[in-house]
Regions:
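Bacterial N-terminal signal peptides
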Residues: 8-17
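Positively charged n-region of N-terminal signal peptides that target proteins for export
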Residues: 1-5, 186
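Acidic/His- and Gly-rich active-site-bordering loop/insert found
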Residues: 26-184
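Histidine/acidic-residue-rich, glycine-tolerant segments that coordinate divalent metal ions
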Residues: 146-160, 175, 179-301, 408
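Divalent metal-coordination and catalytic microenvironments
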Residues: 85, 106, 126, 139, ...
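Boundary at the C-terminal end of the N-terminal hydrophobic targeting segment
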Residues: 21-25
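Sec/Tat-exported extracytoplasmic proteins
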Residues: 70, 74, 82, 86-89, ...
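Metal-dependent amide/peptide-bond hydrolase catalytic core
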Residues: 264-267, 271-479
């Protein structure tokens, strides 16, 4: 039995090492990460997260009592609240009805709520009144719907994030009070995840809203039950969101030389980008739309706007890609004798994932009945999309199977109201509660989480420095 267990751990560690390597998508990245990956493999071997998960998930009546309370809240009230929010979708930054329902529920359970944090009208922070100091446990909620062509809709099941997170927060807060145990619970209401600008979590992070948290958790819909490998990464590449705002001068189109055409400048921008693509590494993604292009065909457009997401697997080379696009905009303005304003409005960056949280959370999801289990860990990525919070504070995003449909579809919205969605939400709520219980009650576990997170954060810094040395810019001589 012992031999089989050791072999299993070695196989798991090898899988984690290989999966971590997949986070580096280009040859340059893989070479820069070579030494870092060796150090990470040594770290993961010393932590032995699978053995840690086996120990923590063993029978524990106190934990199961707290988990049962979270399930009771879901069954009696919070699944119905999830359905209500699903049926009344609100897009980002105008989620007034949704946050009122969530905040009212938190107030009824002894949370003190402050709304409008970080200067965002529908962002809020709810702190449990009887805070007993560290450890400080954070729970992130989202509640915005997607923008559809005919209506807003909860095709990413953000409608369930609030109820799931609240069930865990209330259950663990009540336990800490009942047992007079140390610890505080804070719920963060984060608007507009599907929209930027602004990037809500980054704005809140920069305003200090998340300061003092030891661990943060959240849930999210998924077509399968999974967890990330340890390391750093993001789901959708590193992103710079940039608007290029061109101004010209109006004139009658029959005498267009009397004006300066801002729309032509935008068209030149797209042409310029296409002309320099061969100078940019092929993994880059430069995706833009024209959001303003003039009001009438008989008037020279004096204002035009292009909105771009500029993506690359790492943020170091992303800066070179961004310079190509910025210079393409400046060249377009120069060629058309217009002016351009470059407005950088948002970023998404690599976050950090740790096996000490991921393996334990994954074990709990399976324990509480998760379906469609993905055996191997996925690529490393932060527990939230911006990287601002998840590169500074350890955490985990729970993702039990809650839909048979693809994300961002009407079918996923329908699943939020059905058996598959409700089952997945119950699994997430129970697993999240169990993990928070372990973090609150096991100082040695908190120390292991911190050790892993701090080490990976240091390795991430070393990796970025290696990339800076690798990504040289050719020297161009004077003509």
């Amino acid at each position: 039995m012992k031999i089989r267990f050791v072999c299993s751990c070695l196989v798991t560690l090898f899988a984690l090492f290989v999966t971590s390597a997949r986070a580096q998508e280009t040859p340059t990245e893989r070479e820069a990460a070579r030494e870092m990956l060796k150090k990470m493999a040594e770290l993961e071997k010393s932590l032995d997260a699978p053995a840690l998960a086996a120990r923590l998930t063993a029978a524990n009546p106190a934990r199961e009592q707290v988990v049962a309370r979270a399930k009771e809240l879901m069954d009696k009230e919070l699944l119905a609240l999830s359905d209500d929010i699903t049926r009344h979708p609100e897009i980002g930054f105008v989620e007034h009805r949704s946050i009122k329902l969530l905040m009212d529920y938190l107030k009824q359970h002894d949370f003190e709520v402050k709304v409008g944090v970080g200067g965002l009208e529908t962002a809020f922070v709810a702190r449990y009144k009887r805070n007993n100091g560290a450890p400080n446990l954070g729970v992130i909620l989202e509640y915005d719907a997607l923008r559809g062509t005919t209506r807003a809709f909860h095709g990413d099941q953000h409608s369930a994030q609030g109820p799931v997170g609240i069930a865990a927060a209330v259950a663990i807060a009540e336990y800490l009070t009942r047992t007079n145990s140390p610890g505080g619970v804070v719920v963060f209401g984060c608007p507009g995840e599907e929209m930027m600008p602004p990037n809500a979590k980054t704005v809140m992070f920069e305003a200090g809203v998340f300061n003092g948290m030891d661990v943060i958790v959240r849930s999210h819909s998924s077509g399968a039950t999974s967890r990330p490998a340890p390391g750093f990464g993001t789901c959708c590449m590193n992103i710079d969101g940039v608007k290029y705002i061109f101004s010209g001068a109006p004139a009658h189109q029959l005498q267009a030389w009397n004006g300066r055409n801002a729309l032509e400048a935008v068209i030149h921008l797209f042409v310029n980008i296409d002309s320099v693509r061969s100078n940019i590494r092929p993994e880059a993604r430069i995706q833009g739309v024209i959001t303003e292009g003039g009001a009438a065909p008989n008037v020279v457009p004096d204002r035009a706007v292009a909105d771009f997401y500029i993506r690359y697997p790492d943020e170091v080379y992303l800066q070179q890609v961004r310079k190509f696009v910025d210079d393409a905009a400046r060249a377009a303005a120069l060629a058309t004798q217009t002016k351009v304003k470059i407005e950088h409005y948002g970023t998404a960056r690599d976050g950090i994932s740790v096996s000490t949280l991921a393996e334990v959370g994954f074990a709990y999801m399976k324990m509480y009945g998760a379906t469609r289990i993905v055996a191997e860990p996925g690529r490393p990525q932060g527990f939230e999309e911006t990287g601002s919070v998840s590169s500074a504070i350890p955490g985990l995003g729970f993702s039990a199977h809650s839909s048979n449909a693809a994300n961002h579809t009407y079918e996923m919205e329908a699943d939020a109201l059905g058996e598959v969605g409700h089952h997945g939400f119950l699994v997430d709520a129970q697993a999240m509660t169990a993990l928070l219980f372990d973090v609150a009650t096991h100082p040695d576990y908190r120390a292991a989480i911190k050790r892993e997170f701090d080490t990976i954060k240091t390795l991430f810094g070393e990796y970025q420095e290696a990339l800076k040395r690798a990504y040289t810019v050719p020297r161009v001589s004077e003509p």
